[in-house]
Amino acid sequence: MAAKDVVFGDSARAKMVEGVNILANAVKVTLGPKGRNVVLERSFGGPTVTKDGVSVAKEIELKDKLQNMGAQMVKEVASKTSDNAGDGTTTATVLAQSIVREGMKYVASGMNPMDLKRGIDKAVAAAIEELRKISKPCTTNKEIAQVGAISANSDTSIGDRIAEAMDKVGKEGVITVEDGKSLQDELDVVEGMQFDRGYLSPYFINNPDKQVAVLDNPFVLLHDKKVSNIRDLLPVLEQVAKAGRPLLIIAEDVEGEALATLVVNNIRGILKTVAVKAPGFGDRRKAMLEDIAILTGGQVIAEETGLTLEKATLQELGQAKRIEVGKENTTIIDGAGEAANIEARVKQVRTQIEEATSDYDREKLQERVAKLAGGVAVIKVGAATEVEMKEKKARVEDALHATRAAVEEGIVAGGGVALIRARSAISGVKGDNADQDAGIKIVLRAMEEPLRQIVTNGGEEASVVVAAVAGGTGNYGYNAATGEYGDLVEAGVVDPTKVTRTALQNAASVAGLLLTTDAAVCELPKEDAPMPGGMPGGMGGMGMDM
């Protein structure tokens, strides 16, 4: 085990605060509509230019071990805020730096760090309660577009695209972001349920121009096992043929004789069929088959439910208005399932989301909800160069998270104004002693900092603007993009309540930990072993004639 260096008290804190300042100073220049760019070096390819706070924070690793500890703690503030709310990383970093800076002054003057932390926690709890009170629901397309635009660094086209996508697939729908092929942003919407499995044979294609198989008003057969013997399928195929409608077979696999017979029947026009593999694996496959069954009003033919292929009837088959099967995707449009059953299933999956422990499980469950509830929208980001594409894509993803947060918890006035207004609730909070009162003062000062930084980045005098905004009421604030004062909500300068709340909570949490740190343990740098001595000189010819 490597030797460790242990540093105590002020020496440890001072070094860690240096690290906090290095990271925060690099991140905070990106805040607000007039935020500056930061250029990030890449190990290969050109550098990346960004105005995204969390992207800057993630790149920073410091040489000094103690400074790096401080920087990593604030990096945690940024990434936690990004994970929970999708935006607000720069605001959280600015708040954390301010709480640490002000707190260190009080610690240096001999105050008890634990009482300071208790005071900070009391003030933050009161501020969050006030933020919830002043929050208003975000329901209209215009409000959603405004939130998206602000989060994407005042890019209105991104806000409009996200609002349009949410309008098409609903608030719960899946919206994904991909690289586009042109200079313009594009929006593709897939209605109905889509899963990533295509036809098992190209002979099922009946629309050669688009290379897809289209089934109008088909039956849907769902089976959780492999189908290789055509005799198992014959009874149900005969019933479908009599009904004169096409059939989609979704099974673990369809192979051999069964697949060959289906292809021949399809080519001869006897029975229009398409076979695809079931999506997912293991338990997830069973769950997704059940989802499709509920969506189409059918049943999964499985031994567990006492159903077999040979005895299957049309009653067990699902139905849909239209199904499109491509090489890699199958889309079920307008399934015949009952709305009440679909709603109950969505509720059930949402409960599983709340109980899920891993991000991967949660993401997959959310996809299932979206597929059941509405559809999938794909925003294709257009840009002239790859560097611009990366930067823009990161902004679109941020904006998307922010709009989801706004729909979830509502919106407040942006531009740092909500935090200024929430200070009124803290003014009435009293600590149990003078040290706790000092902790409350720390938060009061920190809550001005985001507005100060936005104004500073815009090249104006921060103290004058903060005084003017603090003298106003409600949504009155300073619009840094135009340099004017007014109602920020009317001007479209809004922040999701969840983003502001999460930023404040996470900043106070990590800053409190730093203030109450009294020792730091880090590895000593390894000393390189000296190089071994060189080989002795040669023995020469020893006077021998050759």
Curated annotation (Swiss-Prot):
Biased composition (Gly residues): 534-546
Keywords tagged on the record: ATP-binding, Chaperone, Cytoplasm, Isomerase, Nucleotide-binding
Gene Ontology cellular component list: cytoplasm
Main location: cytoplasm
Residues reported in the UniProt entry to bind ATP: 30-33, 51, 87-91, 415, 479-481, 495
CDD domains for this protein: GroEL
Signal peptide range: none
One GO process term, biological-process aspect: protein refolding
GO molecular function, one term: unfolded protein binding
Entry-linked HAMAP family: CH60 (MF_00600)
Protein name (database record): Chaperonin GroEL
Organism listed in the record: Paraburkholderia phymatum (strain DSM 17167 / CIP 108236 / LMG 21445 / STM815) (Burkholderia phymatum)
Gene: groEL
